[in-house]
Amino acid sequence: SAAASAPAAAEGKVLNIWCWNDEFQSRFNDYYPEVKEIAADKSTTTLKDGTTVKWTINANENNNYQNKLDEALLNQDSAADDDKIDIFLIEADYALKYVDSDYVLDVKKDIGLTDSDLAGQYQYTKDIVSVDGSQRGTTWQATPGLFAYRRSIAKEVLGTDDPAEVQTYLSDWDKFNDVAAKAAAKGYKMLSGFDDAYRTFSNNVSAPWVTGTTVTVDENLMKWVDQTKEYTDKGYNNKSSLWDSQWASDQGPTGKVFGFFYSTWGINFTLLGNSLATPTAEGGKEEVGNGIYGDYAVCEGPQPYYWGGTWICGAAGSDNLETIKDVMLKLTCDEAIMKQITMDTQDYTNNEKAMEEIAKSDYKSDFLGGQNHIALFAEAATKIDMSNAGPYDQGLNESFQNAFKDYFTGNVEEDAAKANFETAIKEKYPELTDVVWPA
């Protein structure tokens, strides 16, 4: 955009950052070397050069974050310099909506990062935020997914809890289904619910959801439908949905579920929290002896996939390009800072070399029974292929899962679920004209 390419006269003294929770705020305050002081209420951060960082945090629920961000970006040109958005954060599921717009700066052309600055990052994290070769965001984290399983249940069902051996039993979907039958015979569920395996299938489609105005349902998604219907009918799952209370308790001390598909943040934060008998909020410690802490391990599972991730975007019209460049350099390209974040927080960071170093070290996770899970993540991260991502992914994936839930529970036949999916997406996206199903 014209606003973006005009040279800024002088750096502004206010840096406005928009996000939906405090995750990036804490990464910034803890690891950005230019931080001088943080306000008691955390609403502002002061940098060493006197710049005031103003945080605007709007929760994600009901599209609230995107709606408020959209309104502010529409008013960006007329806003006073100190009120203009300088940096805003986006998630993978809707990244392309912003990346493919005039509101975002090219991290190389406009902001000034170089190919060599970005060379250490995982390719898929660059692909997700690129349009026609123009990279328009950058991230400090990579979020490869793995299959997290209960060691004690694996021992009972497979005779081993060793991650390399367990992987040989789960290395493709046919084998995975065989283990589901074995687990059921011992009184265990293979998965908690309908959605658990969805991303592993949807990240491995052979073509994008939408070409022109045609929606193509990939064969791999129908494999998920068939598998989930079979698991539901045979009692291999607990009919839970992602994030519901059944799903959470299935991960805890009373759970009887073999495992969960989870990415980096999910294992270190969600799964760990759910595994404890006494939550940390009630004084419980993150240690062996509290619930099933230490009884999980991870293996690659049937297919590589990713789940989640947060990208930093520079906003067109910002008068803080030098500061934005430095934030991106330090928080997404600096190998030493990336490594430190992982060592301190277990968040998996976007630097291949730093992660390889930890992968080859004696680093281990007590939560995962002493396993070095970074080694598996490092292997998985290079296999993620996001060439089929598109701007409709979030909406179509949600509608697809919702439509087929009624089929899994026996409320409708498969043909009705297909028709309901078509109706739902045409309401959501009137511009999409037809839907093609696999033969």
What do the predicted segments below correspond to?
Residues P33, K223-D326:
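Extracytoplasmic/periplasmic substrate-binding proteins
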Residues S1-L96, D115, K339, V412-A439:
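Conserved N-terminal structural module of periplasmic/extracytoplasmic solute-binding proteins
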Residues G291-G294, T342-N402, D406, D434-A439:
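Long, aromatic- and glycine/proline-rich binding clefts that accommodate carbohydrate-like moieties
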Residues A40-E61, A80, T160-V166, K229-D244, ...:
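A local structural motif
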Residues Q66-K84, F88, S101, A154, ...:
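Short helices/loops that flank or line small-molecule/ion binding pockets
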Residues R27, R151, M328-I358:
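Periplasmic-binding protein-like
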Residues A6, D77, I90-L146, G283-E300, ...:
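Hinge/lid segment of periplasmic solute-binding proteins
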Residues K108-D117, K126-A197, W209-L242, A316-E322, ...:
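Helix-loop-helix "hinge/cap" segment bordering the ligand-binding cleft or interdomain interface
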